[in-house]
Amino acid sequence: MILRRLVLAGSLLLATAFTSAKKADSPIITATRFDHEPINLFYFGDSDVVMLQDIKNGDVYVSRDAGVKWDMVNLDGLKGQALSLWSHPTDRTKAYILGKAGKHWVTNDQAVSWHEFSADVEFFQSLFPLVFHGKDSDRVLLQGHKCVGRDCKEVTYYTTDGFKTVDILIENARGCNWAVSTPIFGDGLNLSKEVNDRIFCIVPGLQSPWSDYNRLLYSDRFFKQDSGTEAPLDSGRAVSGVVRTASVKKYLLAAAKSARTSELALYVTDDGSQWHRAEFDGQRVEEDAYTVLESTNYSIQIDVVAETPSAPMGTLFTSNSNGTYFTRNIDHTNRNGLGFVDFEKIATIQGIILVNTVKNWEDVEMSALVEKKIISQISFDDGRTFQPLKAGKHDLHLHSVTHLSNSGRVFSSPAPGLVMGVGNTGGHLKDYYDGDLYVSDDAGITWRKALDEAHKYEFGDQGSVIVAVFDEGRTGKISYSLNHGKDWKEASLPDGIKIRARILTTMPDSTGLKFLLVGSSKRDSDVEHYVISISFTDMEERTCGKDDFETWPARLNEKNEPDCLMGHKQFYQRRKADVDCFIKKKFQEPVPQFEPCKCTVEDFECDFNFIRSTDGKSCVPARSLPVPEGACKKPNDKYMGSSGFRLIPGNACIREGGVELDKQIERVCTDTLTVPVSGEIVVQKTFFTADNYKGYFYLERKDSSNGDDETVIMITSELQIYITRDHGKNWKEIFPGETITRIVPHQYFDDVAYFLTNSGDGWYTLDRGENFRKFKAPIPPNQDKLPVLSFHPERRDWLIWTGAEECKTRGPQCHSVAYYSTNHGSEWHFLMQYVRRCEFIKREARGSSNNLVFCEQFENENPLNHHLQLLSTDDWFSEKKVHYNNILDFATMQEFIIVAVRGEKPEDSLSVGVSVDGETFAYADLPANVQIPVQRAYTVLESRTHAAFLHVTVNNVEDHEYGSIIKSNSNGTSYVLSLSAVNRNTYGYADFEKMQGMEGVAMANVVGNVADVEKGAAKKYRTMITHNDGAEWALLSPPSKDSEGRDYSCSTKGGKPTDKCALHLHSYTERADPRDTYSSPSAIGVMLGTGNVGEYLTLKSDADTFITRDGGITWQEVRKDRYQWEFGDSGSIIVIVPEARPTKTLFYSLDEGKSWKEFQFTEVEMLIRDISTVPSDTSRNFLLWGNEVGNGKKPGVAAVNIDFSNLKERHKQCVLNEEKPEADDYYLWEPMHPFQPNGCLFGHRAKYHRKRPDRDCFIGRELQHLDSIGDICECTRSDYECDYNYEPQIDGTCAPVPGLKPLDPKLICTEDPKAVEWYEPTGYRRIPLTKCEGGKQLHHIIPHACPNKEEEFLKKHPGLRGVGLFFVIMSPIGLAAAIGYYVYTRWDGKFGRIRLGDTGSGGFFASDSLLVSIPVAIVAGVVAVATALPLLASSLWRSVRGYARVPGGSSSQRVYSSRAAFAAQRADYAGVVDDEDELLGAEDFDEEENDDRGQV
C-alpha cells in the first residue's frame, strides 16, 4: 500500500471559526464550530498537532496549530468510515484510524501521511482493539471479532512492522497482551529475546467454552509453530478460569476465578516467566471488585472491595517490589459501581497520594440505603499514613475520580506542586454543584479557595498559567491566573458564544501556553458544538530568567523539612508564584533533582518467603525456608540465612551510617519446616449430643479463593447446627437458641449460605461461615411447599424470595408472592404474586439479559383453575411475555430450558417445549420408536455435552417403572432414541449417571426382563455403558478373576461380555446419598461401584466392590463385600469403608486401587453411615459419619476426621512441568473408545494429566487434568448417531422407523437465511460433541441448492457431476456397511443386544434418606404424592454428579407442627427441585395434602 499525502481540505470541514479581538494583555480565543460532537481528542506528544473524530459522521479532523484551524483527514475510502481514533501511548508520532469495513489507517509522522492496511475485523466494546508493545512501537496487536451474519468469533491480528504487514495471530482468544507491555517492563532483568516476542492470550477451555475454564496461553513465535503453552501461574501449574490480564508499570497481572465462587486469585510476574500468587493480608478479592490503580516503579497499588457492591467501599493495598505480598494502607476507600476509586497520585512527585474515604462506613455496611459521607485524606509517605486536607483551619474535601468532570488527571499535572480540586470545607463532601474551586501550590500541604462555584481547570507553562471554566451551567467566559491561583482574571469567548463546557485540556506535559476547550451550545432547537483554542503566547509577558526560579522541595516531613522516599529527597526548579514572566520552555518537562539519604527502616521490605508480622514491625516466614546446601543435617543445627528484610529494589539510600535490616542472621533449622511430619494418618473423633445427623453440606473453598479452610455444616437429629472450618477436627455450634427452620446453600456460589426462620428473619454468610450477617425478608416464607429462595447464576447477591401473604388463617386468600433483591436482601422489590416458582434464567451460554426471569403464575391469578402460565420478563415484570398457558413444570440447564406443557385435555400427552436463549421456544420432536401411548412423565438428565437427555417413562406402574432415554440435537428440538428400558423408580429418578471429568462416558441400568415385567414380574437389571455420549451402548466387561484370584461362575466370549456374563453395578436409585457417585471430577478415568458378575444384578447384600482405571473399559474386583468409597487428593488417595456392618478399620489405596492398606481408625467398632470429603475430591482429609456400636461405645453420633496430610507418602507436593508434562510426577493419559483402535474419542485424541501411581507426593489444589486436544481424527461411524425417526439395527446401521418419515430436510433453507444447500436424509447425524473432520460424512451425502441460492451452490460444488457424484455417494455407504457387518460378526454384544422395552430396577431410597432436593427434575404428572423430610441439606443438588437441575413434577413437602413431629417423620421424599431450599421444614401444621398438579 503506498503512502498517501494528507489533503488539508478546509472547504470540506463542516466548521466555522470565530476569533476574539487580539489584545496584548489577554489570551487570544478562537472558536471552531462543528455540527456534531467531537470525541477522541488527543495531542501528539511534543507538538501542536491535535486530532479528533466526528462521533456521527465518522470523519477525522486534524489541527497543526493547537486547535486554531481544523482540516478533515481526506483519504481514499475514509470519509464516513472512521469507527474510532487512537493515539500510540508511547510513540509521539503514531496514530491509528480503525474503519468500519475492514480498512484501517496508520500514521508514523503525526498525521502528515497515512498508510492503509486491511484486517477483516469488527470492533465491540468488550475488548481494547489495539494492544501495544512496551518497547517497540511497531509491534501492535489488533483484536476484535470476525462475523459472518450473526455468528461472530474473536480474532487477533499482529504486526511487527507498524502494519506494513498484518497476520492473524490467533482466533477465539478472549484478550491478548504482550509480555513486554510497558516501557519499563523487565528493566534490569536482561530479558531474553523470547520474552520480548512473548504474547499471552486468554483462550477457551479445551472442552468447554465457559469462562470458568479459560486458559492463559503464551507463545514466543506468534502461535505459528506451536499452539501455545499454558502459563504456569500457580507454583509452576496452569490455572483455569483466567478472566483478564492487565499491565501496570513493570508488572503483568492475571486474574483467575474458579467456578462456583466470586473470589478471584491474582497472579503477578515481573519477567514474563515466573509467576506468583498475590497475597492480600487475608482480604478476599472478588470478581469485578478490585481496581488496579496507578502504581509506582517499585510497587503495585490495588483497591479491593471490602463490603457490599451496592454501596461499594474498598481497601487500598500496596505490594512489595515483586508484586506478591500486599499490605493494607487505608480502609473504606470510596468507590462506585463501575470500579472507579477516589485515588490519585500527585503527578511527578513520589509518594503523595490523595484518596477519599467513607466516614460513616459502619452505617453504610448496615444498610445500602444510607448515603455515604465522604472525606478527603492525603499521604506524603507513599500511603503509610494519611491526614486530612486543610484549607486554613478547616478540613477540605474534594470530588475525585468517581465524579470525573474533565479528561486526564483529576487534581494534578506535570506542573510541580500545583494541585487543584472542586469541593468544600466542613464535615464531609457535599454535592459537586455545592462545591468551589480550591488550589494548593505546595503539593497538597495547604489549600486556599481559588474561585467560587465548580470549575474545570488546567495547567500550562509548568504551572505559570492556570485556566478555569465554569462547570455548573452555560458560560461565555474563562478565568485564568498567572500566580498559582492567588488572583484571577476573565476573558470572554468570541462572538457572544455561551457553552456548556465538556473538556478543558492542553498538551500532555503542561509546558505550553495553549489550551483547548470543548463544549456545546443550544441555539433555537439546534445543538452546536465548539472546539475553542485559548492561546497565551502573544501576551506581553517576558521570558523568565534564573532569578525567577526557586528550589522547591517536593515533600516535607512533619517538621516542614525535605523528606526522604526511596532513599532520596526530591526537588524541582520552579517559577516563583508572584513573578511576571512565562517560562516558555515548550515540550521541556520539569526535571527533578535528587539528594540521597541514609537508609532507614522505610527503605526495606520483606524478603522472598517472608511476610509482615501482625504488628507490621518485622518480617516472619510465610512458608518453610529453603535450606542452604550442606546445612541442617540435624534438626537443632543453625545456619546463616535471610533476616526477613531486603532493600527495596531501586532504592538509592546511602548504606554507610544507615539502618542495615537486610544483614543475614543466624537461624535454627526448625525454621525450614512449617509442620512436623509424623508419617502417620491422624484421627480426630467428635461426638454430638444427638443420636444421628440429619444432613451435612460443604462450603468448599475453590482454587481462586483465599485461605485454607475446609468448611462443613452439619445438622443433628436434635436440630442443632454445627460448623467446622478444618474438615471436622474442631466443631462449633452456630445460632444456639435460634429457631432456624431452613438452611439454603447458594445454588451457584459455594461460599454462600442462608439460614432462615419462619418469621422471615435470617442470616447469611458470604465467606464460608467465617462471618454471618443478618437480613430481613419482605414477608414470611411461603406455605405452599415452594422453594423460598432462588439465586442468580452469575450475580451472587441477586435473590428471588417467594413468601406467603395473607396466610395467617390459611384461608383461600392465602397466596405466594415473589420479591427480588440485588443486594442479598438489604432491599426488596415486588416481582409478582400468585406464583409457584420464579427463577433467574441468565446463563453464560445464553445471550440473555442478566434481568431475565421466568415465573410460573396461576392464570388470572387464580390458583383454583390449576392452569400455570410460563411468563418471562427482563424488566422485573414492568412488561411480561407469555410463553405457555398451561404447563406442568420447567427446567433450566446450562444450555437448554425444557418445559413440560399440558395438553388441552387431562388425558392428553405432555409436550416438550425447548429454548436455548430463553426468548424463543419450539416444540420438541420426540422419536416415534419410543412407544408411549400417552406421555405422562419425563425426567431431565444431565445435559452438558451440547445435547439434552430425557428419560421418558414407558411403564408407570408402581414398582415396575421403566422408560427410554432420548437424546437431542444441538438445539434440543429433535430427539432420537439412545437407550430403551432404562430403570426408573417411583419418585421419577432414573438409573443414569455420567462419568465426571471425561467426555461422553455414561452408565445406565436397564430392565432385562421387560416382557415379564409387563406381566407383573419383578424387575431384573443390567448395567450398560456408552463411550460416545449415548450413540452406542454395551454391557460392562467383567474382570477375568475376582479379588481372590478365582474364576467367576460364568464365562465371557473372547474376553467380551455377553448377555449371560457381564458386570452389573447398583446405581442411582439405590443410593442413600445421591452424592455417592461412581466417579470423581478430579480422579480422571477412575470409577468405583458395587455389584456382581452374572446375567443380572443381584441383591445389594450380595454385592462386591469393583474399580476401573480406564474409563470403564476394564474392571477389577477390589474386595469381597460392599464398601462405601471416597476419592481424595484428586484420586491419589482412595478410601473404602464397609457399608452396613460394624468395623474398626478402613482400607486405603495410594496407587489408584492396585494395592490396599488397612488402617484402624477406632478402638470401638462403629457403624459408618457415610464417608465424605470436599466435593472436588481434592482434600487429603475425610469424614466418617456414624455411631459406636461395640463394647465401650459412647452415646451420640460421631464425625471422625481422617487426615492423610502427614502421611509420609503424601507430604511432598507433586511437580508438574507444563512444558514437559511427563518429566516429573505426572504422565499423559489418553482415554480410548473400546471399539476404535486408533485412540480417537469424539473425533480427537485427548491427553489428561494423571499422577504416576508410584510417586510418593500429593497433588494438592485441583489440577487442570486435560492437557491438550491432540490430533483431530477422521470421522467414523462412532461420530454419528441415528437421526430423527431412524433407529439402530442389529448390525449397527440406522434404518427408518417403519411407517414414519424423517424431518423435512429443506426446512434448513427457511430456518437459516445463510444456508446455501440442504442434504437428503441419510439416517445419521453427527454427535454434537464430536470434533472429527473429513472421513465418513454419513450425514451429508447428496446436496441440493436452497431456493434462490443456486449460484452460491454451484460455486461451492464445482464439477460435482455424473459418475463422480455416484462414487462420492456410494463409497462411504459401502464402506460403512462392510465395517458394520465385520464388527458385528466379530464382536458379540457391541451394540448390547438391546431389546426395545427392556427396563431395570431401581430400588427405593432408604427410609432415613436425608434428601430434600437433588439436581434431577421429574417433569411428570403421574408420580404418587410424596412428602419430604425437610431437614436435608438442600445443597445435595449441587454436589450430586449424575444429574442436572430440573424442578420436580411433585414439589409437595411434608409440613410439621413441632420439632417432634419433624424428628419422627421417616421415609418421606420431597419434590425434586434443584433450587429447592428447605433444610429444616418446621411449619404450622402436620397433615398431608395432594399436589394441585394432577398427582395421584
From Swiss-Prot:
Q: Which InterPro entries match?
A: Sortilin_C, Sortilin_N, VPS10, VPS10-sortilin, WD40/YVTN_repeat-like_dom_sf
Glycan-carrying positions: N190, N297, N322, N971
Q: Which residues lie on this side of the membrane: Lumenal?
A: 22-1362, 1431-1496
> Principal place where this protein is found?
Golgi
Q: Where are the annotated BNR repeats, by residue? A: 61-71, 377-387, 438-448, 480-489, 722-732, 819-829, 1106-1116, 1147-1157
The reply on keyword Transmembrane helix is yes
Keyword check for tRNA-binding: no
What's one GO-annotated cellular component?
Answer: Golgi apparatus
Per UniProt, the keywords (alphabetical) are: Glycoprotein, Golgi apparatus, Membrane, Protein transport, Receptor, Repeat, Signal, Transmembrane, Transmembrane helix, Transport
Protein's name in the database: Vacuolar protein sorting/targeting protein 10
- Could you tell me the gene encoding this protein? VPS10
